[in-house]
Amino acid sequence: YSFQVGMRSYIFDLGYKGNLSWGRWKMGAEVIRHQLLPQNVEISGNLANYQSDTQRQNAMETSAYLQYCQPLGEKLLMELGTRASGYHCQKSYYRVMPHLKFDYNLSPSAKLNLNLGIRNQYLFQTGFSSAGLPTEFWFAADADHRPQYAYHVALQGEFWFAEKEYRLSVETYYKWLKHQMENSSNMFDILFSSYSFDGSLLHGKG
């Protein structure tokens, strides 16, 4: 038996980002147009002949952020901000993502920082995790796939040694993940069964 398998995919982004600083304030805006082709499978040969009907996705994403830094003493700095975003691909989604950060200088060679916030993402990356092949691809949130987001808290320590020639960074974090997706199919599903991109996706949280 002989056969050829093609799994074509691509992502193309075109956008603009602008930033402005004024004293302790920072602000900015961004607009991005995403053009994606999720995994488009083609099989030819005497084992099977198959071509998926994966459709190209066009998405538009806009966002704006505002950030403020406030010293709280000689060693402590607070950073407070928020990002608002809008997105459209078959359906429109809007999100507000606040964040809070504290930086504390333990000494000239040691620093701690604490991060809390919400993060949101409109693009997903998945693939055949068991294939051992470069099969990773991107696809966009749409009417059937809601954007993923996470609540997170992280504590990080940075330490410098030998007159700051060496740096050690240690971090511990916890995330509450929502609307996660993973591809549960593999190469054998494509070759020996009816493969469906939407049917192969697992939805969950973590």
Ranges and model annotations:
Residues 1-92, 105, 169:
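Face-selective signature of the C-terminal outer-membrane beta-barrel domain
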Residues 5-15, 53-65, 163-206:
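Outer membrane beta-barrel strand-and-loop segments of large Gram-negative receptors
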Residues 7-9, 59-61, 93-95, 138, ...:
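Membrane-spanning beta-strands of outer-membrane beta-barrel proteins
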Residues 10-14, 64-66, 98-100, 143, ...:
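Membrane-embedded beta-strands of outer-membrane beta-barrel proteins
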Residues 16-20, 68-70, 94, 102-105, ...:
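Residue-level signature of outer-membrane beta-barrel architecture
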Residues 21-22, 72-78, 108-109, 151, ...:
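Short coil turns and loop connectors of transmembrane beta-barrels in diderm outer membranes
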Residues 27-29, 80-82, 100, 114-116, ...:
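Membrane-embedded beta-strand positions of outer-membrane beta-barrel proteins
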Residues 37-44, 90, 108-153, 172-199:
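Surface-exposed extracellular loop regions of Gram-negative outer-membrane beta-barrel proteins
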